[in-house]
Amino acid sequence: MIMHKGKTIYLSSVTVDVESARKIVELRNGDVQKKFLNPTKNSIEDQLEWLGNYLERNKNGDEFYFFIKRIDTDEIIGTVRIYDIKRDIDSFCWGSWILNERKTHTAALESYLLINKFAFYHLNYQNSHFDVRKDNSKVISFHKKTGAVITDDDEMNYYFQYT
């Protein structure tokens, strides 16, 4: 199990089990969270099947999925994922970034730093690409402040890149 520790949170690899599937469905279906995520089925069985397929992608080094947990309570407060790895341009996408209302004050910044540290320094990627829903103004502002550049957009999303 991969773990990366910050000041108030840590990242722990998602496991393929019913409890993980249940927690992901719960996190993805919060009123605020689901507004900015791709729609998924609310079924634990469907999520468990998706996690089984994810495990194969993870074994191939094509995807990494983490729970974000509080250090003080070990409570799962979110998720973050690396996927859409483009080896030809040495880039990874990160997303499925969810934090619930029980997050720590610094959980967003810490999880952002930890996922990038993992991808840039552990996996040795040189670039990052990702998309953000246009109506998710807080996250857009966050990424602009951290140096991400908008490279494209469509009706729904802005596409960002770090180089």
State what each model feature region is.
Residues 67, 74-84, 93:
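Conserved beta-strand in the GNAT
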Residues 105-118, 141-145:
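Conserved acetyl-CoA-binding loop-helix of GNAT-fold acetyltransferases
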